Amino acid sequence: GFFALIPKIISSPIFKTLLSAVGSALSSSGGQE
């Protein structure tokens, strides 16, 4: 099922790149200090 794919998605480099981009956007907008 879908939940079996979640670990693969989380461990994928693309997901980590997206997380980094989101984190950068949040920190640059002052969302997180």
Swiss-Prot record:
SS bonds (residue pairs): none
Localization of this protein: Secreted; Target cell membrane
Xref: InterPro entries: Pardaxin (IPR009990)
Main location: secreted
Pfam families membership: Pardaxin (PF07425)
Keywords: Ion transport, Membrane, Secreted, Target cell membrane, Target membrane, Toxin, Transmembrane, Transport
Cellular-component GO terms for this entry: extracellular region; membrane; other organism cell membrane
GO biological process terms, semicolon-separated: monoatomic ion transport
GO terms for MF: toxin activity
Coiled-coil positions: none
Domains: entry comment: Consists of a C-terminal hydrophilic region and a predominantly hydrophobic remainder.
Family stated for the protein in its record: Belongs to the pardaxin family.
Described function: Exhibits unusual shark repellent and surfactant properties. Forms voltage-dependent, ion-permeable channels in membranes. At high concentration causes cell membrane lysis.
Subunit organization: In aqueous solution exists as a tetramer.
UniProt protein name: Pardaxin P-2
Organism: Pardachirus pavoninus (Peacock sole)
